[in-house]
């Protein structure tokens, strides 16, 4: 057993060593890869630091200028918007005020006209009514003329009729002549009536027109009042909006001013933060490089230690594999040592894996920083393009400066003629040189590494020129008398400077060539950028396709997993059904076990009762045997009283112990009681003889010597049989005690199984039934377990053993009952030959 265990442990140790070796190889490969990646990352970081330092210096000024320009443009836009809003508001206000003044004038005119119409007469009202009243007057005049024409026609007709009537009256005589004045008399009355009616009608019409005009004037006045109220409300709203706009303008102006100040402060803070960040990044990079170098040294040392430990372990394993079969105990000790060393190696491996994880995290952090720096690098490349454009502009400015310098040389030649012009040109040159110095300083800060030593020389020369010019100006201001001599020296210097400027022009041409080369490099970078963008797009498309494929695969896998889940659920249902069947079988087995236990208890009770009866019978038989021995001794001592033997047998037949044995027999000796009853029924005359000596039948006077010898022989045989029975009873007691012990032991085993199963199941689930052997099986044996068949076999074996033991107990009980019956028969049997001769006699 120890040898098998040591071989298993040896195999396990070999497997662990192989795993450690593979892990070591993997770790060494990962370390090599990480080292290569770190070197590439360091190179990238160094290159990016250089580019970052270049671009940051260029950004520090370009950003400020751009942000200031943006803020100024925003401020100008806001001011323009405010001015436009103010102009719009002024125009709206002026139009509203003009409309309001017009409405007020119209209202005043209408009120005056209304008062005049109310106060004035009808004619004046008609005269002042306007074009409508004039139209009515024309209509009325036309009607009046028409009426006059009608009246004229009527008068003519009336005149004709009057002429006819006068002719008739002349023909008839004088009497009708008196009627003429009566007919002509009503004519002026009719004319007066007509005029009166016409005037009346005209007055009525004028009155109606006046009422209509008053109603229209009232409606117009109400409408104008409503419009006035609306316009006043609009005016109030416009004034409120104007005040609001004024306040908003002030707030916007203040906000823009505050924003400009905040942005300037933020620029300064950002500049400081960027400087601090760059310093911090440089420090972190230096610390990371140092830590990487230290980790590399540690890793190399640990790798060497690992290799040495692995070699030592391999040597030990080879030695142990050679001597494993011969030295088992030594292998066990070495296995323990190897376990400790393996534990230490596992700890070292865990530490190394942790360190590797830390390194991976650091590499991921560095990769993230690299991505950020790459993004910043891309921004800087865009800014670099802007700076290149600015560089071209600066080169153009340099060309212009060269032209200006040539012009300055010509002006310097004319300085001897005109001192005042020289002063003015010197001042102009000073201002232009200041601007040139500022531009050159900006270019110096922006293109420090690109232009290099040539630009430094150029800037030094420009600064020297500026210093010389300033010095010359100071000398001109200090001493006017020596200006001519100094100007002559300056002319000589200017000639030399023109030569230097020619050399500078050559350098500028070289710089232009460099700029052209930079433009070519820029085009190459742009092409590379386009290629990178195309590759990025292709990679994105590939990633999208891969994502689609992964999603499709995931959907297919999900479908497969769902089908597998359905199959597993079906299997679980089948297992549940099998579990229910097993639980049913376990419950039936539990019931059977309970029945067998109850039967065993009943049999134990019966066996204990039978043992008690047998012990009682043995005790009584011993007493009887003692009495019989005493009687036999008495008979042997008194050979004359042979008839006492017969009395003894009869008294034994009728003794209370005999009746007690018959009454106190067990359930298993039921046949023995029946036999005793038969014997008692057959031995009634013997009882009567022993109970009443007066009514005894005549007995034989003496027994023969042969009969006495037979009796002694029978007594000896009965005594031997009694001893045999006692030995059998003792054997049965021992076997029953062993059976009781076996039963107690098995019940204790079952109780221990039950307790263990209860403890195990109480941890898992506290609501299961734990009573009996069925609960034990239900708790220990779950459906689908591989040990179910073994447990069933064990239970079957236990049941078979219990059944066989029960069968043996039944057989032993039957044997005991048969022995008891036989003993009772033998005990009852000896008096029969005595009774037979008595009956015969």
UniProtKB/Swiss-Prot annotation:
Membrane topology label: Peripheral membrane protein
Gene Ontology molecular function:
guanyl-nucleotide exchange factor activity; identical protein binding; ionotropic glutamate receptor binding
Q: Cite the entry's keywords alphabetically.
A: Acetylation, Cell projection, Coiled coil, Endosome, Membrane, Phosphoprotein, Protein transport, Synapse, Transport
Q: Does the keyword Membrane apply?
A: yes
Top-level lineage group: Eukaryota
Q: Locate the region Disordered.
A: 532-551, 558-580, 681-706
How this chain assembles, per its entry, is:
Interacts with GRIP1, GRIP2 and AMPA receptors. Interacts (via C-terminus) with MAPK8/JNK1 and MAP3K1/MEKK1; the interaction promotes MAP3K1-mediated phosphorylation of MAPK8. Interacts (via N-terminus) with RAB4A (in GTP-bound form). Interacts (via C-terminus) with STX12.
What's its job? Answer: Regulates the endosomal recycling back to the neuronal plasma membrane, possibly by connecting early and late recycling endosomal domains and promoting segregation of recycling endosomes from early endosomal membranes. Involved in the localization of recycling endosomes to dendritic spines, thereby playing a role in the maintenance of dendritic spine morphology. Required for the activity-induced AMPA receptor recycling to dendrite membranes and for long-term potentiation and synaptic plasticity.
Protein's name according to its UniProt entry: GRIP1-associated protein 1
Originating species? Homo sapiens (Human)
Q: What is the lineage of its organism?
A: Eukaryota, Metazoa, Chordata, Craniata, Vertebrata
